[in-house]
Amino acid sequence: MNDTHRPYQRCTNCVMDTSDSAITFDEHGVCDFCNDFYQNIQPSWQDKLKDPDLLRRTAEQIKAASKGRKYDCIIGMSGGVDSSYLCYVAKELMGLNPLVYSVDTGWNLNVAVENIERIVKALDLDMYTEVVDWNEMKDLQLAFFKSQVPYQDMPQDHSIFAGLPNYAVKSGSQNVRTGANSDPACIRPPEVWVYLDDLKMIRDIHHKFGTRPLKTFPLCGMVKYRVYYPIFKGMKRVAPLDMVEYNKEKVKLFLQEHFGWQPYENKHYENVFTRFYEGYYLPHKFGYDKRKCYFSNEILAGTMTREEALAELEQPPYDPQQMEEDKAYIAKKLGLTAEEFQTIIDGENKTFRDYRNSWGLIQFGTVVLRALGVEKKKFR
């Protein structure tokens, strides 16, 4: 699915390349993602780091807003490095009493579950785990595979994207803490690789290929998430990792030493489905390697050199034997034979444009948010 109508080119600053068909380069060969980071994101991020009192003031504001409530905020927890460290920052550095929220989609590896348990126990936090109905998750994931789109992790992602704010409002928590931060997450995969959580498209794909109603599956549209919840329910999203020095490798060592936290191979590989989707399905079927985005973010953050990233990209995303085992496991768990699953993988590639979608509305909203200075990251 790479653009064969233009010569191959890789950014001279990061490792993004023309596998993103919309990428552009300046006269020095630097991509538009890098230029956007240096012009729009880095200045505001550095301003936050120059304000040592910002974290304390933010904590005081959250405590004031949550006065009289059992919890000061709610934190989405995956067991990964960002959300694990966020729990530490919230409890120990900000003095907050957060409720930890996790989602069991049926695919988490033991390392993720154990990491969550270690952090929650060590910090003496309360946790709520939402268990997604497996039959509904399975049906939606099968529908997505049959749709032939690249975004096979959308059913899982959406259950988390929707579940967290839905539960926050239901439980009366106005402050949602996120592990996202502007620095190492400014280059997100282009929409042809990983489309946004478009509820209209999710429903259309499920209508065409699903076999059972989604009665309990967590759902949340962009208008509800971006407008209704913040304006009418007072929900606020806060990103404390923007307010502290955040070197991911140092944070990993800190978590290991203090909590017995265990690392995993790559970003998001704490989940067997995501590991297979990002490490096998996307590269083999579409030619997309999300590590290019992850490594480019680390390059911009100063925690990885371009040479190190290029060397990593020469290696497979993870062990090829494990890929085949994951492939067989996922097919069996979804009720597919090996031949049926391979037929899906070999099928005609499609995108969100082949289904009903809200891309025009999402684009318009992004333009407005960027104009207002609310959104600084580059989307396409």
Predicted segments, located by residue:
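Hydrophobic positions on the alpha1 helix immediately C-terminal to the Walker A/P-loop
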Residues: 85-86
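Nucleotide-activated chemistry modules centered on ATP-dependent adenylation/adenylyltransferase
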Residues: 2-73, 89-380
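Short, glycine-rich nucleotide/cofactor-binding loops
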Residues: 73-82
